[in-house]
Amino acid sequence: MSVRAHRKSRSQRVLVHTTVNPSYRKVAVSTASGQGVKLEEIPCPRGTLSVADLAKYDGEDVTAIVIQQPNFLGQLEDVDAITDWAHARNIMVIASVNPTSLGILKPPGEWGAKGADIACGDCQPLGVPLSSGGPYAGFLTTRMEYVRQMPGRIVGRTVDLNGKQGFALTLQAREQHIRRGKATSNICTNQG
């Protein structure tokens, strides 16, 4: 999604810190390899990422950086400094968060001066059980300017003719039944 949203940049590089959940990194490698996106792992000598670790990427063409908060080692990242560093270089920030941690930690939308560009996570920590062995539910959110690049169907809240609240699929021009060749909804199951 970050590469699609960042079309003006020719970069296909996404930085991923080695303290991001290894399972998430494996899925990202599988998904990215078929799309020509290069995931580059940032080594983790101290268990957390610092702006000093990112200095070698100054001036390089990078599309996005993935930050997990808290990281896989249970450490808290300096999300404000990393987010501001990335945005100063026109690099999108992708936040992977545990939703239960957001009760005490700053939400991705408040990281740094502008907040993360994309936030995602697993709903299992909220007590969502497996159903016949899977799948878990997840969440994905982004800034309004990137909504059209989101995979999957988007449901919006509306009011019907009788004034009752209802829900409907929105932005359907991006759906596979409308624009098959440019659809973003055909890569997910929409279960949940």
Q: Over which residues does each language-model region extend?
A:
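Generic beta-strand/beta-sheet core signal
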Residues: 17, 42-44, 65-70, 92-97, ...
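Short acidic (Asp/Glu) and glycine-rich catalytic loops that position anionic groups and cofactors
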Residues: 7-10, 35, 62, 117-121, ...
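Short, charged, surface-exposed secondary-structure boundary motifs
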Residues: 50-52, 105, 128-132
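Conserved beta-loop-alpha segment that forms the PLP phosphate-binding cup at the N-terminus of a helix
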Residues: 1-10, 138
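PLP-dependent aminotransferase-class I/II
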Residues: 16-75, 81
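Catalytic PLP-binding core of fold-type I/II PLP enzymes
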Residues: 76-118
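Short, surface-exposed connector motifs at secondary-structure boundaries
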Residues: 8-13, 61-65, 85-92
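Active-site C-terminal subdomain of aminotransferase-like
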Residues: 125-192
